[in-house]
Swiss-Prot record:
The protein, known as: Ribonuclease HII
Residues annotated for a divalent metal cation binding in this entry: D36, E37, D130
GO biological process: DNA replication, removal of RNA primer; mismatch repair
Gene designation per UniProt: rnhB
Cofactor(s), by name: Mn(2+); Mg(2+)
Keywords: Cytoplasm, Endonuclease, Hydrolase, Manganese, Metal-binding, Nuclease
Amino acid sequence: MPAVWPPRTVIRKSSGLRTLESALYRAGLGPVAGVDEVGRGACAGPLVVAACILGPNRLESLSALDDSKKLNESERERLFPLIRRYAVAFHVVFIPSVEVDRRGVHVANIEGMRRAVAGLAVRPGYVLSDGFRVPGLPMPSLPVVGGDAAAACIAAASVLAKVSRDRLMVAMDQEHPGYGFADHKGYSTRAHSAALNDLGPSTQHRFSFINVRRLVVDGEPGQGGELECGKLAVDVPVDMPVDRVLREGQLSR
């Protein structure tokens, strides 16, 4: 029986992004998958969750990996194809805003993490998640506080999720003009709030968020028309048209 790991751990950044993964591989618990999400705090657009396995060896091509929120856009875009090329396996899940409303952000996030791990072409022996415990996984897992800045596989998942969501929000800006999705990516900013006040919510907004819900008149959304019901978690490629996001496809390897 492998050693029982603590229920939650903090890894110092100075110890290196591969320290925890290397320890797990040495203990015979690999392959090690990292899982992370982006879009929890946005009031529009999907919640995006990615899982990624990098393998036991350090790759110089991915030496710039860091928490995707600390990398600038050009650095994330440069790393995105490299991660897809060198990863042993990865899988990205998009959870539509209507399901975030229906299930709640936390429940949708945990379900998305399970789906992302289940979608990996290589079954991991261990899963590292960024901060959140993920119940229901068929393999041992460990939530790591600040994991996207402490474990390379989580950092890679963070970049995959962030770039995938950002690209989708840019495309969504074309289908729902006026909100500025390409700029703020669905997060609450002064410009986004002003657009919401002028246009009302679209079908891509999260009606469970108070700043959106207060603008709904008689339960009807604004510019976007009727709310569309989607599946709980739909896996889509980053270049798929937004009108197909809720229905089909996948981004994985």
